[in-house]
Amino acid sequence: MPCPVLELTQQLIKRPSLSPDDAGCQALIAARLQALGFTIEQMSFGDTLNFWAWRGQGSTLAFAGHTDVVPAGDLQLWDNPPFEPTLCDGMLYGRGAADMKGSLAAMVVAAERFVAQHPQHEGRLAFLITSDEEADAQDGTVKVVDALMARQERLDYCLVGEPSSSRQVGDIVKNGRRGSLTANLVVQGVQGHVAYPHLADNPFHRAMAALKELVETQWDEGNSFFPPTTMQIANIHAGTGSNNVIPGELLVQFNFRFSTELTDVIIRQRVEALLQHHGLRYRIDWSLSGQPFLTARGELVDAAVRAVEHYQELTPRLETTGGTSDGRFIARLGAQVVELGPVNATIHKVNECVSAADLQLLSRMYQRIMEQLIL
């Protein structure tokens, strides 16, 4: 028997939507939603396609996701072409299968089944879809949220279809994410000949103690919802490439993944106080990718947990680990936000895949969440 979730996922994978190119995915999704009576509002910015769609009135449950995917990498390493969906031994292979075209298909089919069974549902069902999540994330969900906030749009609940699961679909529900703050530090020295160090000032040597202290600092202890804040050096560069030149500058890039125990302002203040304590001449630029957010136990979390328990005979763990997601933008609307999606073992990898059976389960879970919140 044909599976509508699998078929739609295959259609989406066939469209090579390398971020921020949508490659026709949103037109396909929007047409399916429009046939259900959804109002479709295109909200594109620059090269990014976005749309906001809704049906009904009242308490609003939105499903959010992205149509863009990361590059496939070396095509020779793939068993099959990445944009030719291949079903083998119950697994669907293709770029975006797990992240996150499978989730999008599951959402759409869940909405189709829900509307068919409950055409006069009480609440409002909505979709927020973007083609700019995997790359810069500058013209995608963040811009749509800005527009919705400007007109005081109401959003009560939002389910993001990111691949949250670890071993079994539904074993983890993300009910928050850590904040992300990146520092680009330039430590200034004086360039010179390595044979005459007294005539130069090596910024690498001067910065080592400060960097050691940065790495060894315990920024907080976390809390019952978040692990302790972490700091990792991501890139470091100094020198001309010559073995006889003392560098004049040291460039260090480091990133914080921070809990609700800290704010980005506190982190900046502590870092700059440390650098000044070590007497460094420096300049530093900061980039905040997102604040931490948390959805406590309530209607949405409980609905997601019950949906998983109904179909999987397991109780999902609530976690806030992992990277950032567009949930960080949607949380600004005051909505309860969770992430529930496929197993993430192969995302961004060669031979990305998802279980066909999991896609069907996921769609049923999404439908059950709709039934709990907007009937």
Swiss-Prot record:
The Swiss-Prot or TrEMBL record lists the needed cofactor(s) as:
Zn(2+); Co(2+)
- The active site consists of D68, E133 (proton acceptor)
What's the name of its gene? dapE
| Alphabetically ordered keywords of this record | Amino-acid biosynthesis, Cobalt, Diaminopimelate biosynthesis, Hydrolase, Lysine biosynthesis, Metal-binding, Zinc
Question: Which amino acid positions bind Zn(2+) 1, per UniProt?
Answer: H66, D99, E162
Q: Which reaction does it catalyse?
A: N-succinyl-(2S,6S)-2,6-diaminopimelate + H2O = (2S,6S)-2,6-diaminopimelate + succinate
Q: Name one Pfam family in it.
A: Peptidase_M20
InterPro entries tied to this protein: ArgE/DapE_CS, Bact_exopeptidase_dim_dom, DapE_proteobac, Peptidase_M20, Peptidase_M20_dimer, Peptidase_M20A
CC cofactor note: Binds 2 Zn(2+) or Co(2+) ions per subunit.
User: What's its top-level EC category?
Assistant: hydrolase
Stated role: Catalyzes the hydrolysis of N-succinyl-L,L-diaminopimelic acid (SDAP), forming succinate and LL-2,6-diaminopimelate (DAP), an intermediate involved in the bacterial biosynthesis of lysine and meso-diaminopimelic acid, an essential component of bacterial cell walls.
Full protein name: Succinyl-diaminopimelate desuccinylase
Q: What is its EC number?
A: 3.5.1.18
